[in-house]
Design a protein with these regions (language model features):
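Mid/C-terminal beta-alpha module of Rossmann-like enzyme folds, strongest
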Residues: 117-232, 250-254, 258-267, 276, ...
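Alpha-helical substrate-binding/gating segment
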Residues: 44-46, 77-127, 131-156
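First extracellular/luminal loop
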Residues: 1-27, 259-284, 288
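Catalytic cores of eukaryotic secretory-pathway lumenal/extracellular enzymes that build
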Residues: 2-24, 65-71, 77-95, 101
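Active-site rim elements
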Residues: 26-32, 93-100, 130, 230-239, ...
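Conserved beta-loop-beta element that borders a ligand/cofactor-binding pocket
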Residues: 9-17, 21-33, 37-66, 120-127
């Protein structure tokens, strides 16, 4: 019999499941972090190879360079920011868990610095590029800051909603399933009424068709949102990651003041509320959020 194609849907799923199983076996939260660790081990095993490994946390919008808020592509936090800015209030997060985020321009400067030290045979084996060990910001703070920005743009909603609600993943899943069942019931009812209206040539049949399509779209959006939050659960709720970044601080301290200005590494100076509501939020809205995503609603 012919070997199964790696592009076959069933084979892809089996490979994905195997990757997740192996990742968890070795203590990694997903296959992404697991495969990165494999790459690092291959580098470390190479005889005679001089190397340094740079491990940035979640890389997001620029702090200053090339200008505040510059971001290319939908980075890791972009879906979460867009959910918050489109009205999502119910979040399965640990309030006190820090979000390990580092601006892209700080990462770029640190990589150049690590490379220069490697050329001089003075680099450490590993450089963590993170912020929470000196200047932590929690998920609870971030989602409330962004929700406040959302309410500024939607003042009528502010009068009707109690704000952000934090819950466990189990409660969030149960709530999502309940909403999904209700939407399915509404859609099935509308379908029956629409079919009756069409059969009897009633004037509101077209409006029922449009309403039914809207319900289907909302149900699909709910499914996408639930899948995204499930993907982020190891970071939002299951773990409390803080990465020690002493090596890059020590390296940066060796530079002159002029060199430090050219290659900045100052996480402790970041004003997080301003960063998230101006640099990150406005950067995503300007450079990432396309017309297709603006049609999606995450208010449920």
């Amino acid at each position: 019999a012919a070997a199964p194609s790696p592009n076959d849907k069933e084979t892809k799923q089996k490979l994905t499941d195997l990757g997740v199983q192996r990742a968890k076996q070795w203590g990694w939260v997903n296959t992404y972090t697991y495969t990165k660790s494999l790459g690092e081990q291959l580098i470390a095993m190479e005889p005679g190879l001089r190397y340094t490994i740079v491990r940035p946390a979640i890389v997001e919008a620029a702090l200053d360079y090339p200008f505040p808020g510059w971001v290319e592509g939908g980075r890791t936090a972009a879906p979460l920011v867009m959910m918050a800015m489109q009205g999502l209030r119910h979040w399965p997060v640990r309030e006190d868990a820090p979000m390990e985020v580092v601006p892209v321009d700080q990462v770029a400067g640190a990589i150049i610095l690590a490379g220069a030290l490697l050329l001089h045979h003075e680099a450490a084996p590993v450089y963590h590029l993170a912020t929470a060990d000196r200047n932590p910001v929690s998920y609870g703070q971030i989602i409330r800051w962004i929700n406040a920005e959302y309410l500024k743009d939607n003042r009528k909603i502010k009068l009707l909603t109690p704000g952000v609600v934090v819950m466990t993943p189990e409660v969030a899943r149960s709530r999502g399933q309940l909403v999904s069942r209700k939407l399915t019931g509404i859609y099935e009812f509308l379908t029956e009424v629409r079919q009756f209206a069409q059969k009897n040539k009633l004037p509101f049949a077209k409006r029922l068709t449009k309403l039914g399509n809207n319900i289907r779209m909302i149900t699909r959006q709910l499914s996408i949102r639930e899948a995204a939050l499930e993907l982020y659960q190891p970071f939002l709720y299951d773990n409390r990651f803080i990465f020690e970044s002493e090596n890059i601080r020590t390296a940066h301290a060796r530079l002159s003041e002029e060199e430090q200005r050219k290659l900045p590494w100052w996480p402790e100076r970041i004003r997080w509320r301003h960063y998230w509501t101006v640099n990150e939020l406005r950067g995503i809205q300007k450079w990432v959020e396309g017309e297709s995503t603006k049609a999606y609603s995450f208010k449920l």
